[in-house]
Amino acid sequence: MYALQAKQERNGFKMKKVLIFYASYGGGHLSAANAINDYIKNNYEDVETEIIDCMKYVNKHLEKVTTTAYKEMAKKAPWAWGTIYYTSQKGPVAELTSTSNKILARKLNILLQEYMPDLIISTHPFASQMCSFLKKHNKINCKIASIMTDFAPHDQWLVGKKCIDYFFVAHNKMKEDLIAKKVPAEKIFVTGIPLSNKFLLNFDRSDILNQFGLKENKKTILFFGGGEFGLGKSKTLKVLSSLLNDFNNIQIVAISGKNIKMKHKFEELAHNSNMPEDIKIMEYTNKVPELMSVSDLV
């Protein structure tokens, strides 16, 4: 169960309450939610926050089935996920999704009535849809903010748009696209996608290079190749192989994440390459901000 027992009073005044929803279809939605949560906690003493996986809360079994399917398609058949992504803009798939979220919203309403937030922040369109449906039917009356964790405005974000108070988008073109889709300009804010404060820190370049055994006189490439999306396994390996064999005076930090099979493939490529001593292979790491600070290309 999520910890929902919050202090109602602190230092004589009532705490504002913010619910931050995400969904586990890729790590970006949670990363954005965590970044927002950290910022609020560090800057607003009178605001209490809670982060919740909306799909896991409303139906754990459905969440497990759909996230597993998502990950498998992303790894083994990214074209299939691409098809779903585009067909869910409009038509039967879009209707099925929005109808399902309306049904699931009833369970989410239990949480909202218990917590009584002053503001709902959503980093996934499913949560935005559920909350906007509840607001439309007068089950909730708090403000709703959609943090669009995409670089293009998928129509799933716009279901129930009349009941969503704020849209935070990655760039100006997205704002223009939303205006073209009848979202009022005063609701749209160009902020970029939320990032951890760690990415704003200034690191000592020499210290970081030494920490990871990197050379000062070589260009550094930070290569991500183990995630759920991207080029797919064969193209990822082809790109890394080209970097290893066709370029001079570079060093590579190749991050395979939690994908152990990809890590082994990286190691095999490195062993057979022209520069095995100039590639560092890493699994999941929380040192990405530091590595990015010394990288010439990501």
Language-model regions: role of each:
Residues A23-A32, L231:
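A short, glycine/small-residue-rich beta-strand->loop->alpha-helix junction that serves as a flexible
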Residues M15-V18:
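Extreme N-terminal starter segment of soluble prokaryotic enzymes
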Residues D165-E228, I260-K261:
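A nucleotide-sugar donor-handling region in carbohydrate enzymes
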Residues A35-L111:
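Conserved N-terminal ligand/cofactor-binding loop architecture of enzyme catalytic domains
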Residues K215-V294:
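Donor-nucleotide binding loops and adjacent catalytic segments primarily
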Residues T83-K181, K187-V190:
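Active-site and donor-binding regions of nucleotide-sugar-utilizing enzymes
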Residues L297-V298:
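Hydrophobic acceptor-binding patch used for acceptor engagement in glycosyltransferases
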